[in-house]
UniProtKB/Swiss-Prot annotation:
Catalytic activity: Hydrolysis of (1->4)-beta-linkages between N-acetylmuramic acid and N-acetyl-D-glucosamine residues in a peptidoglycan and between N-acetyl-D-glucosamine residues in chitodextrins
Membrane spanning stretches: 10-32
The name this protein goes by in its record: SAR-endolysin
Native source organism of the sequence: Bacteriophage PS119
Family matches, as CDD domains: endolysin_R21-like
């Protein structure tokens, strides 16, 4: 599935804000609830049983039964993306475009830094093979041992943005 024109335009507008801004727009979408994660203000269990809230935030700080505000959700996302950046930036040993970095932040926000650090995707980045690294995103479409259409769509969008700097 191709990226919607509205999401494409929003991501392009975020480029000047850097990789965290790009990842944030990918996750939240142009309308704030139509991105790669969607938003839910009440905690719920995701497809693999992890307590989740807002734009996919997980962690011990989630309060079951609480209804989160949009501002709280955006603050959690920003905090989470700053954490993602700190976790993965030291492992990226080559210069990459901000669009590639933003797509990687979105990806790692979804799969976790541990998975990224041991991935072929990271190895390809550090070998200077940006296209090969971006193509690796298509392999990450499973959760709980099952392939998910939503993850397939997400990875295609992330791959598209990942490759923007190569075009």
């Amino acid at each position: 599935m191709a990226m919607s024109p509205a999401l494409r335009n929003s991501v392009m507008a975020a480029i000047s804000g850097g990789a965290i801004a790009i990842a944030s727009v990918l996750i939240t979408g142009p309308g704030g609830n139509d991105g790669l994660e969607g938003v839910r203000y009440k905690p719920y269990k995701d497809v693999v049983g992890v307590l989740t809230v807002c734009y996919g935030h997980t962690g011990k700080d989630i309060m079951p039964g609480k209804t989160y505000t949009e501002a709280e959700c955006k603050a959690l996302l920003n905090k989470d993306l700053i954490t993602v950046a700190r976790q993965i930036n030291p492992y990226i040993k080559v210069d990459i475009p901000e669009t590639t970095r933003g797509a990687l932040y979105s990806f790692v926000y979804n799969v976790g830094a541990g998975n990224f650090r041991t991935s072929t995707l990271l190895r390809k980045i550090n070998q200077g093979d940006i296209k090969g690294a971006c193509d690796q995103l298509r392999r990450w479409t499973y959760a709980g041992g099952k392939q998910w259409k939503g993850l397939m769509t997400r990875r295609e969008v992330e791959r598209d943005v990942c490759l923007w700097g190569k075009q």
